[in-house]
Design a protein with these regions (language model features):
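Crotonase-fold acyl-CoA enzyme core
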Residues: 3-118, 150, 155
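C-terminal alpha-helix plus adjacent terminal tail
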Residues: 76-82, 101, 105-172
Length: 172
């Protein structure tokens, strides 16, 4: 499942109400975006039971960086939602009583964008994250040149330049 997430055309959003440990923390880190309740906590706590969290170390390390990830992995200590936001494990922290509404608002904001651009942009993003910097820029430059040729991009740019209402996206 973790390997499938980057290849899905739709963004995958984690919604974290309370505690995400070990594989739960791994899933949060593997998702494209994550919205956490202000009450949420996160840990790779396997080490406290004698098992280093090997598979969680992959997406957690790629999201929060090696020093922070190793601190979490070596100690098993929990971090709070604000620390998870600061460290890049989650993309938003919201009050607990607004978690459902704010997560849905994020999903709706994404769904209101051109679907083909979201899908191809997500694929390009995940691909360039595995590349060297110069290769990533080359990929992104080619992507932008191709994206500018789509009907949605042309309609969106025209609407912006000519101060027209946002167009209905066609996915083309």
């Amino acid at each position: 499942m973790m390997l499938a997430i980057p290849h899905l055309p739709q963004p995958v959003i984690a919604k974290v109400h309370a505690m995400a440990t070990a594989a739960g923390c791994q899933l949060v880190a593997a998702c494209d975006l994550a919205v956490a309740s202000s009450e949420a906590t996160f840990a790779t706590s396997g080490i406290t039971n004698g098992l280093f969290c090997g598979t969680p170390s992959v997406p957690v390390g790629r999201n929060v960086g090696s020093k922070r990830a190793l601190d979490m992995l070596f100690t098993g200590q929990f971090i709070d939602a604000q620390s998870a936001l600061r460290d890049g494990l989650v993309s938003r922290v919201v009050p607990a009583d607004r978690l459902d509404q704010e997560t849905m608002a994020l999903a709706n904001a994404i769904a209101a964008q051109p679907p083909q651009q979201i899908a191809s942009g997500k694929a390009m993003f995940h691909k360039h994250m595995e590349m060297k910097l110069a290769d990533a820029y080359a990929l992104a430059t080619d992507f932008m040149a191709d994206a500018l040729q789509t009907e949605d991009a042309k309609a969106g740019i025209d609407a912006f330049v000519n101060k027209k209402p946002k167009p209905d996206w066609t996915g083309r």
